[in-house]
UniProtKB/Swiss-Prot annotation:
A GO biological-process term: translation
Name the record gives this protein: Large ribosomal subunit protein bL31
InterPro entries in alphabetical order: Ribosomal_bL28/bL31-like_sf, Ribosomal_bL31, Ribosomal_bL31_A, Ribosomal_bL31_sf
Record note on cofactor: Binds 1 zinc ion per subunit.
Gene: rpmE
Species this protein is from: Pseudomonas fluorescens (strain SBW25)
Amino acid sequence: MKADIHPAYETIEVTCSCGNKFETRSNLCKPLGTDVCNECHPFYTGKQKTLDTGGRVQRFADRFGAFGKKPAATPAE
């Protein structure tokens, strides 16, 4: 590597919106704020929400399932 062409690589403090703080190294050289971290992200905390895609599909089928079908033939007199 060439000398004196690379940015400074220093330890910075990262602060999450939940209040968790940790240190990492970066060339940003100033404190960093983030929205989620491993302490508050739903994937890591186990508080994931599952989407009800089956209910949405069923609701669509209820509304538009008969669309395009021919009406039942009535018996001729």
